[in-house]
């Protein structure tokens, strides 16, 4: 089957994926071009030493300009691959958010995940009552119909270069 890792391996035979994006999310992904780089980059993600920034259009206008969402998330086994907030058994999940721009019935937000749970940003924004536009799993009909695609984009990632030990930041412009 067609996947990013196989495409990268045509030019870089030892390339390995370090982390994933949800299938409908656009933006940056990190790959190690050899086993050494893959190991060091993977440890940075595991130890939460990677800076990640996403942009998203969400439904409605948030009342505050910024905030922190701290809600535990667990797999919704009856509705996989959906996730849900579950205070008893969920894994700790935190997301910082900041309003960038407000329009009539939508808001552009910067999202910074502190943890990296599956669908974390999507679940957290939905729990605030502001689902991400075009989200076929979590958005209500009105928010779903406001975009033909999921309006969630991994726009910036900062990692430590494994050999030089210097921070490097990669950026991808927002396509929506």
Features from the language model and the residues they span:
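Short beta-strand segments
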Residues: 67, 71, 93-95, 107, ...
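Short histidine-centered loop motifs in beta-beta connectors
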Residues: 109-112
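RNA pseudouridine synthases
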Residues: 1-94, 101-104, 151, 175-176
């Amino acid at each position: 089957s067609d996947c990013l890792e196989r495409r990268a391996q045509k030019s870089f035979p030892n390339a390995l994926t370090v982390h994933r994006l949800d299938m409908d999310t656009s933006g940056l992904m990190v790959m190690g071009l050899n086993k050494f780089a893959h190991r060091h980059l993977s440890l940075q993600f595991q130890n939460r030493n990677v800076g990640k920034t996403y942009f998203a259009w969400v439904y409605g206008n948030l009342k505050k300009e910024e905030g922190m969402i701290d809600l535990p998330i667990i797999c919704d086994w009856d509705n996989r691959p959906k996730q849900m907030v579950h205070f008893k058994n969920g894994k700790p999940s935190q997301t910082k958010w900041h309003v960038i721009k407000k329009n009539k019935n939508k808001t552009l937000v910067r999202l910074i995940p502190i943890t990296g749970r599956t669908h974390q940003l999507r679940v957290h924004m939905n729990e605030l009552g502001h689902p991400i536009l075009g989200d076929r799993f979590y958005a209500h009909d009105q928010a779903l119909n406001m975009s033909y695609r999921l309006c969630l984009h991994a726009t910036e990632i900062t990692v430590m270069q494994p050999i030089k030990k210097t921070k490097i930041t990669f950026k991808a412009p927002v396509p929506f």
